[in-house]
């Protein structure tokens, strides 16, 4: 049943017994009752007023509890908002307990640095100017060259001059393992 807001209605009722035990005719009509409906916003006003009264009474009750019974107030506050543990105290005690159980660590006072072998070996300048073996037919060196034989290949620091007249220095022809005496 939908009723329009701010309307007046007239109601009359009648009843009839209609069940498994009692059955009967309709009763007479009741006297008319006049009813007027409220506005749509009436319930919003009622709920707002009710919430305002309840919140103010709860606040007043908490203030009275705090002033008159501080022990009960602290107990209620602790039940509603439990306090967080102090992590410095809790974890500090835990770390002290575990440090007491663990064996003491050995301290190194004089630490020696381990010298790693170098991948590059610097040889002293020899007085004789004998060419080093560069071909497989000659005795092998301790290291491996990237190109098998360079004896017959002419070495140049720069390729021929370009049209711009500048020397390109990016061409090293993979001679990074050749001794410097061979370049002269």
UniProtKB/Swiss-Prot annotation:
It is found in: Membrane. Gene3D superfamilies: Immunoglobulins (2.60.40.10). It is a single-pass membrane protein. Its main location: membrane. One of its GO terms (cellular component) is membrane. Keywords: Membrane, Oncogene, Receptor, Transmembrane, Transmembrane helix. A motif (Box 1 motif) lies at residues 80-88. The keyword Transmembrane helix applies. GO terms for molecular function: thrombopoietin receptor activity. A motif (WSXWS motif) lies at residues 26-30. Truncated form of the receptor for thrombopoietin. This protein is synthesized as an Env-Mpl polyprotein. The WSXWS motif appears to be necessary for proper protein folding and thereby efficient intracellular transport and cell-surface receptor binding. Belongs to the type I cytokine receptor family. Type 1 subfamily. This is Myeloproliferative leukemia protein.
């Amino acid at each position: 049943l939908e009723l329009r807001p701010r309307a007046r209605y007239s109601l009359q009722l009648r009843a009839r017994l209609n069940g498994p035990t009692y059955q009967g005719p309709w009763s007479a009509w009741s006297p008319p009752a006049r009813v007027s409906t409220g506005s749509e916003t009436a319930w919003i006003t009622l709920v707002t007023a009710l919430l305002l009264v309840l919140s103010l009474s709860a606040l007043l009750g908490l203030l009275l509890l705090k002033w008159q019974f501080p022990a009960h107030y602290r107990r209620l506050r602790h039940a509603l908002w439990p306090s967080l543990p102090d992590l410095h105290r809790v974890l500090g005690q835990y770390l002290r307990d575990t440090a007491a159980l663990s064996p003491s660590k050995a301290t190194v006072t004089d630490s020696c640095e381990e010298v790693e072998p170098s991948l590059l070996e610097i040889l002293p300048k020899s007085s004789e100017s004998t060419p080093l073996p560069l071909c497989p037919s000659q005795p092998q060196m301790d290291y491996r060259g990237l190109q098998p034989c360079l004896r017959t290949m002419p070495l140049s620091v720069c390729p021929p001059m370009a049209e711009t007249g500048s020397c390109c220095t990016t061409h090293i022809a993979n001679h990074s393992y050749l001794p410097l005496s061979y370049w002269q």
